[in-house]
Amino acid sequence: IEVKSPVTTLYVIGNGFDLAHGVPSSYSKFRDWLGKHSNLRKTLETYIKNDALWWNLEEALADLDLDTPSMAIPEMLDAFDAYDPDAQMADYYAAIDMAMLPVDTITNELPKKFRRWIESLKVDSSVKPLSGLVKPGAKYLDFNYTEFAETLYGAKGVCYIHGSRKNRKAKLILGHSYKKYVSDVSVKMPRFKD
């Protein structure tokens, strides 16, 4: 984001923006969109042991239990008779693939279905609760995947932190917890004058 003037207004937009405009964009709505019998939903709920899964999906993805599928490998090898002297190499690989299927489901299906859901979100263009508050020439840092700040308020040069659904070739970034990598972060914030 290029700021040409020290008095430029910066709007930081999160999911509250879409929700305030009547867009059903909470992760619990994504869960509902998947449906009760969705293989992806069942896999997420089985392998992510986090009570906040559907309220904080991005952070919950960091809690993906990779040990459980790995521990299932010996069981699958037995089920596919991969230890049998007459077993083929294909039996061994089939057992490994079956044990790792949950990880594959999450890493491959989740991005596709998430994008499809994001692309299905619509906004009523007559609902503009922020009319009169948005300043011309402002800059926008948008954590959403939707372009509603642009379509409703004419925002220009929006920086989409996690990607935008408008760019169909780009991947949307989902999941960003650093808690396993950063144990203690201390940041000194500068003091600002009013």
Residue ranges and their predicted role:
Residues 2-194:
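SIR2/sirtuin NAD+-dependent deacylase catalytic core
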